[in-house]
From Swiss-Prot:
UniProt topological domain (Extracellular) ranges: 1-25, 84-100, 166-187, 411-418
Subcellular location: Cell membrane; Postsynaptic cell membrane
GO annotation, biological process: adenylate cyclase-inhibiting G protein-coupled acetylcholine receptor signaling pathway; chemical synaptic transmission; G protein-coupled acetylcholine receptor signaling pathway; G protein-coupled receptor signaling pathway, coupled to cyclic nucleotide second messenger; presynaptic modulation of chemical synaptic transmission; regulation of heart contraction; regulation of smooth muscle contraction; response to virus
GO cellular component, one term: plasma membrane
Protein name as annotated: Muscarinic acetylcholine receptor M2
A single GO molecular function term of this UniProt record: G protein-coupled acetylcholine receptor activity
Organism domain of life: Eukaryota
Stretches of the chain found on the membrane's Cytoplasmic side: 49-62, 123-142, 213-387, 443-466
Composition-biased stretches (Polar residues): 228-238, 246-256
Species: Gallus gallus (Chicken)
TM region(s), chain numbering: 26-48, 63-83, 101-122, 143-165, 188-212, 388-410, 419-442
The encoding gene: CHRM2
Biased composition range(s): Low complexity: 287-298
Length: 466
């Protein structure tokens, strides 16, 4: 952000060491700016504490929001108040060292905010477009590395240039009572940084969200089509059913592993089964759903496998005769926190009364899996995340666009933008940090409820709030 383009355009003039505002105007500006700063600080602290105390908010996407809240908190504490001081008294009273430190902090934090938004957009894009491969790589460690990279890169890009430019060129040209970045005295540099720091990221984020929206709509249509197909009569020997399966478990589940359970006489036993089953047809389903395939296996092979695998501490070899083994492979697209990932479960059914018993058990499973599909599921966590991302992207674009439009105009016409308009435009960039926590609360009921519990000091069971 170019926080002193207007001041830079008039830096050659004599600086009046008195406030350009009347006393009543100064009081009004201080009250409004101070209130915005306070709301920004409280709001972003609430975001950070909510993610810390509520385990349902401890997802990869919310860790990115935590990083964004850190940047917004710094803006609320330092940037807003120092810029208010600079505005109301009409000059910079704290000296060149504090000036450069403030500018470095302001630009590093602002750039980190933009990079966090880019990370969030790319993360959601890969979640939606690569649901089978990306969630495996999407770990807390990876998220931490991406967040660290965003902050380190922002620091490298801005801090050294702001702090040491005067030594590189052989002297400081910024007046003592002014505060702006020295290398922004060149309009071409100002124009280029505006393109790189705002317009290019906005274009990338807009394209990504458009792709996310398209992919989400395509998956919804696919899910509806599969749901309609699952209403057809079902044969117990080949079943493909669908259930709505809300999954709030944030612990990553291996997509390669198979859970083996034995169902004997319609009841599940705790024995480990080592035999191999004939793999049935698998059918991918939409988000938060399960595909079920039931395929009867070879009786002779199954009996041989049973003899080799049934081990019990309390029983000798248990021989099951005149029975057939059916393998049901359930392919579930469960959510790893806020991103879909497929998991497999193999259930083995051993019927003691031949085909009739086996078919009865299979029909029960089919009935169990198809019943929840009749109910309208609540909004999935994926939809909440996508909605939150849309809100913060819109807030970012709306609040940052006016200032960056003025930057482009100022590159060609230094006297075309009034000082008051510059100040308002720059303050809008700061207000984005105030709006972000409200976006989280409005788009995510869990954030909203946790905020409420924290503000009302209701700490009991706050960690399990949904």
């Amino acid at each position: 952000m170019n926080n002193s383009t207007y001041i830079n355009s008039s830096s050659e003039n004599v600086i009046a060491l008195e406030s350009p505002y009347k006393t009543i105007e100064v009081v009004f500006i201080v009250l409004v700016a101070g209130s915005l700063s306070l709301v920004t600080i409280i709001g972003n602290i609430l975001v950070m504490v909510s993610i810390k105390v509520n385990r349902h908010l401890q997802t990869v996407n919310n860790y990115f929001l935590f990083s964004l809240a850190c940047a917004d908190l710094i803006i609320g504490i330092f940037s807003m108040n120092l810029y208010t001081l600079y505005t109301v008294i009409g000059y910079w009273p704290l000296g060149p060292v504090v000036c450069d430190l403030w500018l470095a902090l302001d630009y590093v934090v602002s750039n980190a905010s933009v990079m966090n938004l880019l990370i969030i957009s790319f993360d959601r894009y890969f979640c939606v477009t690569k649901p089978l491969t990306y969630p495996v790589k999407r770990t807390t460690k990876m998220a931490g590395m991406m967040i660290a990279a965003a902050w380190v890169l922002s620091f490298i890009l801005w801090a050294p240039a702001i702090l040491f430019w005067q030594f590189i060129v052989g002297g400081r040209t910024v007046p003592d009572k002014d505060c702006y970045i020295q290398f922004f005295s060149n309009p071409a540099v100002t124009f280029g940084t505006a393109i790189a720091a705002f317009y290019l990221p906005v274009i990338i984020m807009t394209v990504l969200y458009w792709q996310i929206s398209r992919a989400s709509k395509s998956r919804i249509k696919k899910g509806k089509k599969e749901a309609a197909q699952n209403q057809d009569p079902v044969s117990p020997s080949l079943v493909q059913g669908k259930i709505v399966k809300p999954n709030n478990n944030n612990i990553p589940t291996s997509s390669d592993g198979l859970e083996h359970n034995k169902v004997q006489n319609g009841k599940t036993t705790g024995e480990s089964v080592m035999e191999n089953c004939v793999q049935g047809e698998e059918k991918d389903s939409s988000n938060d759903s399960t595909s079920v395939s039931v395929v009867p296996s070879n009786t002779k092979e199954d009996e041989a496998a049973k003899d080799a695998s049934q081990i019990s501490a309390s029983q000798d070899h248990l021989k099951v005769e005149n029975s057939k083994l059916t393998c049901i492979r359930i392919v579930t697209k469960s959510q790893k926190g806020d991103c879909c990932a497929p998991t497999n479960t193999t259930v083995e059914i051993v019927g003691t009364n031949g085909d009739e018993k086996q078919n009865s058990v299979a029909r029960k499973i089919v009935k169990m899996t198809k019943q929840p599909a009749k109910k309208k599921p609540p909004p999935s966590r994926e939809k909440k995340v996508t909605r939150t991302i849309l809100a913060i992207l819109l807030a970012f674009i709306i609040t940052w666009t006016p200032y960056n439009v003025m930057v482009l105009i100022n590159s060609f016409c230094a006297s075309c933008i009034p000082g008051t308009v510059w100040t308002i435009g720059y303050w809008l960039c700061y207000i984005n940090s105030t709006i972000n926590p409200a976006c989280y609360a409005l788009c995510n009921a869990t954030f909203k409820k946790t905020f409420k519990h924290l503000l009302m000091c209701h700490y009991k069971n706050i960690g399990a709030t949904r």
